[in-house]
């Protein structure tokens, strides 16, 4: 039965404050100047979907997943103890975490259906029409409130879903996943999490005095027009690219790019170009692509175990007419140039820029922001002792301009990249047509395969 047609109930137990399993330091820790920018002062939600355990994955002890997850989270907070604290704001809007050990919010719940009643769990992807029942509604206050809200929903078949809402100023998606994986490992009996978490927020703080050494177009308005007034709602959809789709797109590139471009470069360039065309910008309008780049590997030595905000936002800027009127290779080159900007010096320069400019939000007007979470969110190793997650990742895109690549499967069982994105309904047909041209009439799937009332039904 399709999830959109299915009525079911979820009974929640009383949410509780879950603290660290052992005493933790009581201290005030200053966040980085990347952590407290306006663009991350919000909550994000992640979902992890687990099928019923098999004979090989079933724990030998008599327990249930919620109790194992509860225990693992409590143990993980001994190492990631700032997550058990509360955010405070000081002079000049500077944020710190007060490590009070108060804990996170944890809730058990039970659904009165089988997990497969939601659809094929391996192909579930945003938008999730059932997400409100799986997620705690609290979690809008950035200051003085719990930093993490976890709900474990058990299904009649033995499968379960974990959702985690977390305060983005404390961690990015890879950082929160690191915390959840540590909890899963500890629940299974690990003595310490690997890698061990590191704080090191000073690596992402501004210098004294600040000195901006790059043009940070991600935060700078470059001949931007005022936002277009519109009352039309934007809807969330998901595109799916198989390896064959990527190969088809790659074949359209110049020889040097065919060898050098990654699948992220190609998919992002395709999505950006088609999106700009679908939104019908004027040919002289400035459009911007922001690429989220993991900066942890840009330090020497790399910041292994860093769970703060480490995704930098370098931008490419061009005119809409030039982007749409050029071949795909032009867009791919811009993606690669943006990615290549990020170095340790770039990180310092970005922190300096943010401090000098009031911790501004990244530019939203005429912008498309994309991150690659396929390797940064390790579902294959997210095992609490009941088997591995088969799908999951961020629940939504947060803002209309944001998108990401995540690993998924289509209804035929092919692995590929799912790309959630937002568009006004009036632009969706044009977007579909543009992608159709580039992938040579190969199908572009959307969430309609499992969530027909939220996706678009067009087949290319």
Curated annotation (Swiss-Prot):
Q: Name one Pfam family in it.
A: Transferase
Q: Which reaction does it catalyse?
A: piperidine + (E,E)-piperoyl-CoA = piperine + CoA + H(+)
Q: Which tissues does the record link to its expression?
A: Confined to immature fruits perisperm. Also detectable in roots.
Q: Where in the cell is it found?
A: Cytoplasm
Q: What does this protein do?
A: Involved in the biosynthesis of aromatic piperamides natural products such as piperine (1-piperoyl-piperidine), the pungent principle contributing, together with several terpenoids, to the aromatic properties of black pepper fruits, and displaying numerous pharmacological activities such as antiproliferative, antitumor, antiangiogenesis, antioxidant, antidiabetic, antiobesity, cardioprotective, antimicrobial, antiaging, and immunomodulatory effects.
Write out the similarity annotation: Belongs to the plant acyltransferase family.
Its recorded name reads: Piperamide synthase
> What is the species listed in this Swiss-Prot or TrEMBL entry?
Piper nigrum
């Amino acid at each position: 039965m399709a999830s959109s047609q299915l009525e079911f109930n979820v009974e929640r137990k009383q949410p509780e404050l879950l603290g660290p399993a052992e005493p933790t330091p009581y201290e005030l820790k200053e966040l980085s100047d990347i952590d407290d920018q306006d663009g991350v002062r919000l909550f994000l939600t992640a979902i992890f979907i687990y099928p019923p355990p098999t004979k090989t994955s079933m724990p030998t002890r008599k327990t249930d997943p919620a109790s194992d997850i509860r225990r693992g989270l409590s143990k993980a907070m001994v190492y990631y103890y700032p997550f058990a604290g509360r955010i405070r704001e000081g002079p000049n809007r500077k944020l710190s975490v007060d490590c009070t050990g108060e804990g996170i919010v944890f809730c058990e719940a039970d659904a009165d259906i089988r997990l497969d009643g939601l659809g094929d769990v391996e192909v579930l992807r945003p938008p999730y029409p059932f997400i409100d029942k799986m997620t705690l509604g609290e979690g809008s206050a950035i200051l003085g409130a719990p930093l993490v809200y976890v709900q474990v929903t058990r299904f009649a078949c033995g499968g379960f879903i974990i959702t985690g809402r977390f305060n983005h100023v404390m961690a990015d998606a890879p950082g929160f996943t690191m915390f959840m994986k540590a909890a899963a490992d500890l629940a299974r009996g690990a003595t310490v999490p690997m890698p061990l978490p590191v704080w090191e927020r000073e690596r992402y703080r501004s210098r004294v005095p600040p000195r901006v050494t790059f043009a940070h177009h991600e935060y700078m308005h470059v001949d931007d027009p005022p936002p277009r007034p519109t009352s039309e709602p934007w809807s969330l959809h998901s595109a799916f690219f198989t390896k064959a789709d990527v190969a088809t797109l790659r074949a359209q590139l110049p020889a040097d790019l065919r060898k050098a471009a990654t699948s992220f470069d190609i998919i992002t360039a395709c999505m950006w170009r088609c999106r700009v065309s679908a939104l019908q910008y004027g040919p002289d309008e400035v459009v911007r692509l922001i690429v989220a780049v993991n900066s942890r590997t840009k330090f020497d030595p790399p910041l292994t175990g860093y769970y703060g905000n480490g995704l930098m936002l370098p931008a490419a800027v061009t005119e809409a007419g030039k982007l749409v009127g050029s071949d795909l290779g032009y867009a791919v080159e811009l993606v690669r140039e943006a990615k290549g900007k990020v170095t340790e010096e770039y990180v310092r320069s970005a922190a300096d820029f943010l401090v000098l400019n009031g911790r501004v939000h990244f530019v939203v007007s005429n912008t498309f922001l994309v991150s690659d979470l396929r390797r940064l969110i390790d579902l294959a190793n997210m095992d609490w002792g009941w088997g591995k997650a088969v799908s999951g990742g961020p629940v939504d895109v947060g803002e209309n301009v944001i998108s990401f690549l995540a690993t998924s499967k289509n209804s035929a069982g092919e692995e590929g990249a799912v790309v959630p994105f937002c568009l006004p309904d009036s632009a969706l047909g044009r977007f579909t047509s543009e992608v159709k041209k580039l992938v040579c009439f190969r199908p572009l799937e959307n969430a309609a395969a499992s969530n027909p009332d939220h996706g678009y039904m067009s087949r290319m």
